[in-house]
Amino acid sequence: MKSLIFVLLLGAVFAEEDKIVGGYECTRHSQAHQVSLNSGYHFCGGSLVSKDWVVSAAHCYKSVLRVRLGEHHIRVNEGTEQFISSSSVIRHPNYSSYNIDNDIMLIKLTEPATLNQYVHAVALPTECAADATMCTVSGWGNTMSSVDDGDKLQCLNLPILSHADCANSYPGMITQSMFCAGYLEGGKDSCQGDSGGPVVCNGVLQGVVSWGYGCAERDNPGVYAKVCVLSGWVRDTMASY
């Protein structure tokens, strides 16, 4: 039970220590939908899905937060950033902190983001991505590298794994609102990297970084909220505010 609790709380409690392992520095502003959630410090990632709304993980919830857009080097003001506060932070009504099911939330911005070459929205899915689809996960942090570029946005390309492989890696823990992506042999992983951050496949937001066991370990891939299953709630909620 102790190890189970550690697994489930890893992303939520240690979000500010998350790191991508085996990845590379993203081309500047190639992930212009990527945002940083800030509460005096960076604590989670997220994705801009319209000029007014950000998607993140429910386990990243804070009642009030600031969204930083247009970032690349998170500790340097590069002149491309926009800082916008939240007006509403809304967790999925069926989110479970016990098993991290339905791990998604929406953040309404107090003012619209200015869309430009540094900041733009990513599309929500109209269908689920197929197994083996290659996707990109992004986030800040790479402290397991000999060259620590963790303050610069990191990217990792990784495939969606089958439900069977995912369930075999985490028996009894994978729900219909989750999927696994990564490499069963280990060595490359988002490592919750940043919790709440995007998994983008062919230009569409298919995943939200959620949880996992360890970091880049064999047979323990990263687990992500399955946006295609949750997108109905996302669209309905955005339309009702």
Curated annotation (Swiss-Prot):
GO MF, any single term? serine-type endopeptidase activity
The record places the active site at: H59, D103, S195
Cite a single GO BP annotation: digestion
Which superkingdom heads the taxonomic lineage of this protein's source? Eukaryota
UniProt key word Iron-sulfur: no
Identify the residues that the record assigns to the Peptidase S1 domain, covering every copy: 20-239
Q: Show the InterPro entries listed in the entry.
A: Peptidase_S1_PA (IPR009003), Peptidase_S1_PA_chymotrypsin (IPR043504), Peptidase_S1A (IPR001314), Serine_Proteases_S1 (IPR050127), Trypsin_dom (IPR001254), TRYPSIN_HIS (IPR018114), TRYPSIN_SER (IPR033116)
Primary location class: secreted
Q: Which Gene3D superfamilies match?
A: Trypsin-like serine proteases
Q: What is this protein called?
A: Trypsin-10
Look up and give the organism this protein is from: Gadus morhua
